[in-house]
Amino acid sequence: MAARRALIVLAHSEKTSFNYAMKEAAVEALKKRGWEVLESDLYAMNFNPIISRNDITGELKDSKNFQYPSESSLAYKEGRLSPDIVAEHKKLEAADLVIFQFPLQWFGVPAILKGWFERVLVAGFAYTYAAMYDNGPFQNKKTLLSITTGGSGSMYSLQGVHGDMNVILWPIQSGILRFCGFQVLEPQLVYSIGHTPPDARMQILEGWKKRLETVWEETPLYFAPSSLFDLNFQAGFLMKKEVQEEQKKNKFGLSVGHHLGKSIPADNQIKARK
């Protein structure tokens, strides 16, 4: 049986950072378990995060009214995307597991990683309206976010000043990763790293390596299955009426995004259902 492959996408500029240490720990742990590890160190690569006409070679379909989604999708089908995008596609295609390592910035991913998502996850390659969520192209791949924060865990709690971390994670984990079909594993959250002493940092790194020993066996986070929705333009991609009726008797919504006007299930974007 061929070794599994992991892709680690790092979005931090400094090799002295804890994010870099987390990346190195992941490489070490996975290789020790027989994984082949690919890397995309976005700052070291000087990765261009800006979508533009330069992402496409050859003649545009409509140069006067350039529309990136349709032009990049066509370029993907015809093999006319820029070499740096194609290189990332090859890594993604080869990977069984994708780890995104980054510091939380303004309640989201760093700009360079946002640009990676926008340029690399083009229509046709990463999704179509006929192939999204459960049916997405990456449905047999697993992914997880490994995030550091400046603030403490309590700041991202239900009563914390920043609000619920589950809500912050939803646009990334559902709106990007699950949308493309990924099975999304529990995020690796490292809070307040700037105020964490060296011995505690070492414990975090060791715990991360320990987790990665069995990461492939982990249960993914729960997202509302596509089968609950009428997935067509005529129906508006809405939740089926019988499902809505069935859900009325439940105290909690299905997920952070599909809360149905009710309380959100606790830690829906942080802990997998047991």
From Swiss-Prot:
Q: What is this protein called?
A: NAD(P)H dehydrogenase [quinone] 1
A single GO cellular-component term on record: cytosol
Taxonomy of the source species: Eukaryota, Metazoa, Chordata, Craniata, Vertebrata
Give the residue ranges for region: Important for apoenzyme conformational stability: 225-274
Per the UniProt record, the source organism is Mus musculus
Q: What cofactor does its activity depend on?
A: FAD
Induction is noted as: By polycyclic hydrocarbons such as dioxin (Governed by the aromatic hydrocarbon-responsive (AH) locus).
Q: Where is this cross-link: Glycyl lysine isopeptide (Lys-Gly) (interchain with G-Cter in SUMO2)?
A: 251
GO BP term, pick one: protein polyubiquitination
Kindly state which keywords UniProt assigns to this record, in alphabetical order: Acetylation, Cytoplasm, FAD, Flavoprotein, Isopeptide bond, NAD, NADP, Oxidoreductase, Phosphoprotein, Ubl conjugation
Residue positions where N-acetylalanine is found in the record: 2
PANTHER family tied to this protein: NAD P H OXIDOREDUCTASE-RELATED (PTHR10204), NAD(P)H DEHYDROGENASE [QUINONE] 1 (PTHR10204:SF1)
Q: Which SUPFAM superfamilies match?
A: Flavoproteins (SSF52218)
Provide the reaction this enzyme catalyses: a quinone + NADH + H(+) = a quinol + NAD(+); a quinone + NADPH + H(+) = a quinol + NADP(+); ubiquinone-10 + NADH + H(+) = ubiquinol-10 + NAD(+); menadione + NADH + H(+) = menadiol + NAD(+)
Q: Which InterPro entries match?
A: Flavodoxin_fold, Flavoprotein-like_sf, NAD(P)H_dehydrogenase_qn
Which Pfam families does the record cross-reference, listed alphabetically?
Flavodoxin_2 (PF02525)
Q: In which residues is substrate bound?
A: 126-128
Role according to the record: Flavin-containing quinone reductase that catalyzes two-electron reduction of quinones to hydroquinones using either NADH or NADPH as electron donors. In a ping-pong kinetic mechanism, the electrons are sequentially transferred from NAD(P)H to flavin cofactor and then from reduced flavin to the quinone, bypassing the formation of semiquinone and reactive oxygen species. Regulates cellular redox state primarily through quinone detoxification. Reduces components of plasma membrane redox system such as coenzyme Q and vitamin quinones, producing antioxidant hydroquinone forms.
Q: Is Phosphoprotein among this UniProt entry's keywords?
A: yes
Coiled coil where?
none
Enzyme class name: oxidoreductase
- Molecular-function annotations in GO: identical protein binding; NAD(P)H dehydrogenase (quinone) activity; NADH:ubiquinone reductase (non-electrogenic) activity; NADPH dehydrogenase (quinone) activity
**Localization per record:** Cytoplasm, Cytosol
According to the UniProt record, list the residues that bear Phosphoserine: 82
EC no. given is: 1.6.5.2
